[in-house]
Each structure stands twice: as structure tokens, then as C-alpha cells.
Amino acid sequence: MKVYYDKDADLSLIKGKKVTIVGYGSQGHAHAQNLNDSGVKVTVAVRKGGASWDKAKAAGLKVEEIAKAVKTADLVMILLPDENIPQVYKEEVEPNIKKGATLAFAHGFNVHYNQVVPREDLDVIMVAPKGPGHTVRSEYLRGGGVPSLIAVYQDKSGKAKDIALSYAAANGGTKGGVIETNFKEETETDLFGEQAVLCGGAVELVKMGFETLTEAGYAPEMAYFECLHELKLIVDLMYEGGIANMNYSISNNAEYGEYVTGPEVINAQSREAMRNALKRIQTGEYAKMFIQEGKTNYPSMTARRRLNAEHPIEQVGGQLRDMMPWIKAKALVDKSKN
């Protein structure tokens, strides 16, 4: 698999274009500020009078309403929540985007599942940093970059891949390395990772571990430290050098326990559940579920958010984190700024 770096990208391509970033959330604020700092002519497109409008203005960026900003753009990057993109594309982007312009996304969901059907005269690309927007921005400011994916869905100009690489470079991606994929692969693997491992799997594993200890009479504080707080220490070791690096760094007792108990907890039944999750993603069943959830104003998700917020692990966690001010000092998320 080829990895692209700074030397493989022509930054002048994106610097010669007017770029409109639709949205100023987690990814939007990072892309807009990074491209602006790289010398790209950037306009942020958001609803006038909203919090995002004020935040983008405060960051020194040019801000316009969506339809107006799209009309003058050579490249339009849509960085809105997946559920909001189809309507915004249909009502404000498609009628206004110039013929022969480039339409860009950071996730393939809507194109892959036909919620957005791009006009045939457009280049359609994806530039997807493999990290949250706050990290995309902080790594750029540090002089580095978050590894990114690029993909081409439509190549009307014959230069879509070069444009994607140039955009990725301006966003810092070619500092970390850029890998080419396609919309199908990015969408399906991204959803699977989120659902089975990173969010769904990890959250349920942590909560179940916490509940098992507290139900057996152990102090909630001890359960929090052992099942949530220390997870970062282990994940950082794996992130740094893989599973073998983590095992090299932990005690023999911890490593032996991993081999004895790990396969009992995450077992053949877990593998079958993962395969079922992947099948839902591949067939489009999950996409239909998510789209329908949005159409009914997210009743299931709202209920689950409330239950999670009320879980004892949240209560004890807040108290313990207050004892560790260095965590807040290094926080990735500042809700007042992004």
C-alpha cells in the first residue's frame, strides 16, 4: 500500500482555488483553520447568527451563508453531521455549486448509501483525517499532521486525485501520511470500527467491567480506576507500538491474565456479533436504521444518552477527575471554542 507524503503533493493546486468549508464543528474548524494557515483562500459557510458563525469570525476567518459561499467556490468541502448533509446538499449546494467544481467529503456515508447523488459534471473526492478535529488542529499547530485517507468517486477533470492530495497536504495530512482508498471501503470499515470496537465495543466493555466489580461489593472508585482510567495507559502503549509493545510494557501477571481471560470475555459469540454488525453495514440495513432514527428526531439515541449520563461510572468519574487537574489542563475538547 502506497503512502503519500509532502513530496507527493502539489500544494499550489489547492492554493490556487477558492475553498468553501460547509460547517464549523469538530472537523470544520480544524480544516478551515489549517487550510487558512497554509495559505489557501478559505470561506466558512454556516447559518448566519448561529454559534458557529461567531466562532469562525472570532478565529479571523471569512464567513458567509452557505448558498453564497458555494457559488464562488472551486472546491466545496461538506463537514456537517452525516444526517444533515442530504438536505443541505439538495437545497443549498447542488443548485449553486459551479460546473466542473470539486465536491469533497470527509466521510463516504451519504455518497455510498445514495443519500447524496452528485452531479455528473463535478469531481467528487474524500479527504478523511483519521482523528477527531481537535487532534487534526493540534497536530497541525505542532508542525505535524494526522494520517489521512483520500478517495475519488468521480474524476471529471482527470485531476481529482491530485486535488485530494493537495487538500490533504494543506490540512497537514501528508505530514502524517496519506493512504488512498474508496468510498465503500472507508464507509464500511469506519462504521464497523466505531460500532464494534472504538465506541460501541469499548464503552460496553468498560461499563460491564465497572458493574461487575461494584455488584460484587468493590468500591466504585476502585472499579473506575481499573476499568476506565487505566484504559488510556494501555491504549497509549498499543497506539505507540502495537499490541506486542503493550505486552512488553506490562507485568507478566497482567500479560498472563490477558491470555487466560481475554478469549473468555471476547469469544466466538463476540466474533459472530461482530460479523452480524458488519453485515448490517454492508447491506445498508444500519444506514436505514440511522436515517429512520433521524427522521423521528432520535428517540432511541436521546434515551441512551440520558441513561449513559446517569450511569454511576459518570458520577464517580467526575469526582475522581476533579482530583486530577492535569487532565482538564490537557483536555482536547473546549466546548467554548469548538
Swiss-Prot record:
Its cofactor is Mg(2+). Substrate binds at residue 251. Its EC number is 1.1.1.86. It comes from the Bacteria. InterPro entries: 6-PGluconate_DH-like_C_sf (IPR008927), KARI (IPR013023), KARI_C (IPR000506), KARI_N (IPR013116), KARI_prok (IPR014359), NAD(P)-bd_dom_sf (IPR036291). The active site is at residue 107. Mg(2+) 1 binds at residues 190, 194. Pfam families: KARI_C (PF01450), KARI_N (PF07991). NADP(+) binds at residues 24-27, 47, 52, 133. Mg(2+) 2 binds at residues 190, 226, 230. GO terms for cellular component: cytosol. Residues 182-327 form the KARI C-terminal knotted domain. Binds 2 magnesium ions per subunit. This is Ketol-acid reductoisomerase (NADP(+)). The lineage of its organism: Bacteria, Pseudomonadati, Pseudomonadota, Betaproteobacteria, Rhodocyclales.
